[in-house]
């Protein structure tokens, strides 16, 4: 597991109040991990803070799974 993947999983677990072991790449935030719309907004904000990035609303709407969050962080993180 890459450093970015580990950081994303930790943030998701903390934001959604689930065990990190439940946060697997194929899980969807709403359907599998019980997130609501406020959780999703807070999760995006936490990812922005952690990786020093700004996630536009149109991109945030597409981040719906653990893997999509990891992929976005990998692609957009600041060096």
From Swiss-Prot:
Q: Identify the species of origin.
A: Verminephrobacter eiseniae (strain EF01-2)
> Where in the cell is the protein located?
Cytoplasm
Q: Which residues carry this modification: O-(pantetheine 4'-phosphoryl)serine?
A: 37
All residue ranges annotated as the Carrier domain in the record = 2-77
Which top-rank group of organisms is this from? Bacteria
Q: Name one Pfam family in it.
A: PP-binding
Q: What name does this protein carry?
A: Acyl carrier protein
The text of the family note is: Belongs to the acyl carrier protein (ACP) family.
One Gene Ontology term of the molecular function aspect: acyl carrier activity
UniProt keywords (A-Z) are: Cytoplasm, Fatty acid biosynthesis, Fatty acid metabolism, Lipid biosynthesis, Lipid metabolism, Phosphopantetheine, Phosphoprotein
GO annotations under biological process? lipid A biosynthetic process
- Which pathway, metabolic or otherwise, does it act in? Lipid metabolism; fatty acid biosynthesis
Describe the PTM.
Answer: 4'-phosphopantetheine is transferred from CoA to a specific serine of apo-ACP by AcpS. This modification is essential for activity because fatty acids are bound in thioester linkage to the sulfhydryl of the prosthetic group.
Q: Which GO terms of the cellular component aspect does the record hold?
A: cytosol; membrane
Q: Does the keyword Phosphoprotein apply?
A: yes
Q: Which PANTHER family match?
A: ACYL CARRIER PROTEIN (PTHR20863), CARRIER DOMAIN-CONTAINING PROTEIN (PTHR20863:SF76)
Q: Which HAMAP family match?
A: Acyl_carrier (MF_01217)
The entry's function note states: Carrier of the growing fatty acid chain in fatty acid biosynthesis.
UniProt key word Hydrolase: no
């Amino acid at each position: 597991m890459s450093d970015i993947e580990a950081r994303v999983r930790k943030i998701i677990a903390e934001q959604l109040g689930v065990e990190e072991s439940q946060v697997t790449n194929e899980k969807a935030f709403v359907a599998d991990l019980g997130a609501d719309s406020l959780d999703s907004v807070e999760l995006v904000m936490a990812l922005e803070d952690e990786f020093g990035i700004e996630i536009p609303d149109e991109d945030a709407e597409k981040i719906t799974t653990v893997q999509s969050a990891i992929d976005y962080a990998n692609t957009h993180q600041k060096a």
